[in-house]
From Swiss-Prot:
It is a single-pass membrane protein. GO terms for biological process: photosynthesis. This is Photosystem II reaction center protein Psb30. Keywords: Cell inner membrane, Cell membrane, Membrane, Photosynthesis, Photosystem II, Transmembrane, Transmembrane helix. PSII is composed of 1 copy each of membrane proteins PsbA, PsbB, PsbC, PsbD, PsbE, PsbF, PsbH, PsbI, PsbJ, PsbK, PsbL, PsbM, PsbT, PsbX, Psb30/Ycf12, peripheral proteins PsbO, CyanoQ (PsbQ), PsbU, PsbV and a large number of cofactors. It forms dimeric complexes. The chain crosses the membrane at residues 10-30. One of its GO terms (cellular component) is plasma membrane. Pfam families: PSII_Ycf12. It comes from Gloeobacter violaceus (strain ATCC 29082 / PCC 7421). It is found in: Cell inner membrane. The gene is psb30. InterPro entries: PSII_Ycf12_core-subunit. Belongs to the Psb30/Ycf12 family. A core subunit of photosystem II (PSII), probably helps stabilize the reaction center.
């Protein structure tokens, strides 16, 4: 995976990490909100 612009790779990795972290975070938030009500 050789990109011309190294920033593109960095941004792609950041987005991938954000998505992987956001998935469980959203599920946890939704789960705790459901328990409180």
């Amino acid at each position: 995976m050789a990109w011309r612009n190294p920033m593109n790779t960095l941004i792609s990795l950041l987005l991938l990490t954000l998505i992987m972290l956001a998935g469980p975070a959203v599920i946890a938030l939704w789960y705790f909100r459901g328990r409180q009500v």
